[in-house]
Amino acid sequence: MKDVVALVTGGSRGVGRGVALALLAEGATVHVTGRTMTEVEAKAHPQGSGSLEGLQAEAASLRGRLVVYRCDHGVDAQTEAVVREVGRGRRLDIVVNNAWPGYEHMVEDEEFTWIQPFWQQPTWRWNAMIDVGLRSAFVTARAAAPIMVEHKRGLIINISFWAAELFNGNVIYGVAKAAANKMASDFAHDLKPHNVAALALYPGLVRTEAVMRAAEFFDLSNSESPQFIGRVVAGLWRDPDLMEKSGKVHVAAQLAQDYGLSDIDDFKPRPLTASDIV
């Protein structure tokens, strides 16, 4: 993937960081956004770790080229400025819409507040998931699409989850992910004449910093590394039938099986189904 240019939003930690590392390992040029630039700043973050500076250090030995941007995706102008900067190279092949502050403060005063009923949910959680997570996916894609349309090839991925279809512990989460799926589907409709794909991708349970901070609340036996999702993204880009997958929802672990991919520890996660979520 040495000639591939990707943009991953929200990559200082979690799934975004893993996607970036996996694509860099494949030799791609990867542009990554995040609010947390330094490790000093990371210590003050609700998740306590993960920075663009740390990503740079981890990526130093990988084949690809990493470009990082401090960006608050709650500010449209910052999102648009990043895409303009990426577009100066007149190429953008892959966009992974992953920016997502909705997992912050999942545990407060040793209580897992994320699963409280909707009438006990704070408004800031709506703002994080909808006004930042969902909105920034639209703003990023809107800015990136003209570059892809010009080149007659591209891939836009909205990171989503089963909560789009089934109750998964948090009403706001379900609303945000359902909208992410619909957005990807409708993106695909508009982009199809231009040979640009858009789809929603469901990770399984990913061992992100937030999940590991609340590890006692999760069964990690079938969990995935953050890099696993990136391997699937690379598989999608190589797929000669990518346009047939456009507009649809895909489970990352199922695609990994189809592509013959495994996780970084050679584990092959079992694809989750609706029955696992229920």
Regions from the language model: what does each represent?
Residues 4, 91-92, 148-160, 193-197, ...:
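Active-site loop of short-chain dehydrogenase/reductase
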